[in-house]
Amino acid sequence: AQGYKAILRFAYNHAGLNTSGGESKQWILRHIEQLTPLLNEYIGQIATMQVGFIGAWGEWHTSPLMNDQSAKNAIVSALLRALPAPYCVEMRYPNHKKALTLEQEGSRGRIGYANDYFTAGEHPLAPGNDFVPNTDDYKQITEEVKVNNFYMSGEIPYNEDTEWGLAALITPMKSLR
């Protein structure tokens, strides 16, 4: 695959509308079960997998399941079983990881983070959406990386004409430093 690897995230609602994707815990668990052989067959082309599945874009919001901790526990545990160790999964927010009760607690170190709003704090909406230095989220992540070797990725917001669009507001080189 030319040295490239994919970061996977599955979602039922890709339009980004503030509606549920219609997903259920049982449906998601069945789909993970169906995906497991395929994930294992192509594991060499997969860098990591974001937990996804719930809500708009698989970002764990705008869904009835966003408040169902039992479903979240089961989904993350199923994904950790689906991918062979040491492969990791990624979650968007540290508080989601902290709230998990896993089937195998020893797998917690295989849960990394997908910073879906990487701005290095250069936007007023960054706190709570970005891992901004000196915040609790940032401190938790920096402590975790001292003892765990997990995957972490980031997405710089794209150019759009909304309050979330940042292309004109951020300096990529400053953010990357």
Task: Please report, for each region that a protein language model flagged, where it lies by residue.
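Surface-exposed, active-site-proximal loop segments in enzymatic domains
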Residues: A1, Y12-I28, W57-M66
